[in-house]
Amino acid sequence: MSSNNPHVFAMVAGEISGDILGAGLIKALKTRYPDAKFVGIGGPRMEALGFESIFSYEELAVMGIVEVLSRLPRLLKVRATLIDELVKINPDCFIGIDAPDFNIGLELKLKNRGIKTVHYVSPSVWAWRPKRIFKIAKATDMVLSLLPFEKAFYDKHQVPCTFVGHTLADDIELESDKAQARELLGLDKEAEYLAILPGSRGGELKMLAEPFVKAASLIKQRYPDIKFVTPLVNQKRRDQFEQALREHAPDLEIDLVEGQSREVMAAADCILLASGTATLEAMLVKRPMVVAYRVSPITYRIAKGMMLTKRYSLPNLLADDDVVEELIQADCTPEKIATAVATQLDNDFSPMYDRFMQMHKSLRCDASARAADAVIKLVEDKV
């Protein structure tokens, strides 16, 4: 590309967490390349910065092996169309943000056509399906990892990798203000609150809304004065959750909030949530938590056979220890969830808080700027 033309960066972000990372990277790249253009698949945060989406990022918001298979024809069509469009555009660099099952194949196709490729957010190759490292090596010029222990795995396999830290750790203050969050959300200043986060995908709510609301009913019996608050990413997810409430806990009162999941977590005394990036946010706002998750039985059996780790949540993976309780698959029952939440409400949080603070500091690296620096070095052939 001529030096007189603006730089063009192609990106694909698969869901909310990717949209957050993508927006941070766009801002950082714009400090170096103010006229740069950004195109691909992105979410509302990226689009607010001028990103041009060829497809809606909700196309990629699927979970589980079985669930992905049902959408496979559409996903393959989206990827094929995207490849054609990006080859025509010929960007300076393609950055696949998470969504590895979609992005790594896309990166391989683009790299074979002479486009530089970066994968932002290491797939959990150190936890399951480790042989993916060989495809990643072929598909990418650089991996940007969020977690400090990941780089050693890539170094071992001689795959270029830069640890950049996590934008959430940069964005979230070391001390979160519960009173301020409650005032913002209009919540009771004095009440004890359990935040309930059943996930952002339709498939997650399908699996988790029922056990979560049933658990909340049991918790209410033990703690009559406790209150509940749930953030939901959009109206579709709200409709799903309200349906679960009507069916399984019609007398239970839960404050429903549109978005603002971070504020909801900061406002809470304890958090019940699905495994995923939200567990990192819960750790960063430093609230006691219980992590629960389940998928279809077939998906679980297949995935379990490929797992190299017994831990699922990011706090436990970062600590390499069982810091927070995880209730996975058969353990994801209302009774076990309620018991685990009660334990958190009744016990001293100080030891867990100290671990959370230590991990927060380890991830605070000005991640977006470090990621942008790595991309710029690649684009300018300095790596």
Swiss-Prot record:
Family per record: Belongs to the LpxB family.
Name this protein carries in UniProt: Lipid-A-disaccharide synthase
SUPFAM superfamilies: UDP-Glycosyltransferase/glycogen phosphorylase
Keyword Lipid metabolism: yes
Keywords assigned: Glycosyltransferase, Lipid A biosynthesis, Lipid biosynthesis, Lipid metabolism, Transferase
Gene this chain is encoded by: lpxB
A molecular function GO annotation: lipid-A-disaccharide synthase activity
E.C. number: 2.4.1.182
Organism: Shewanella halifaxensis (strain HAW-EB4)
Enzymatic reactions: a lipid X + a UDP-2-N,3-O-bis[(3R)-3-hydroxyacyl]-alpha-D-glucosamine = a lipid A disaccharide + UDP + H(+)
Function: Condensation of UDP-2,3-diacylglucosamine and 2,3-diacylglucosamine-1-phosphate to form lipid A disaccharide, a precursor of lipid A, a phosphorylated glycolipid that anchors the lipopolysaccharide to the outer membrane of the cell.
Record has Lipid biosynthesis as a keyword: yes
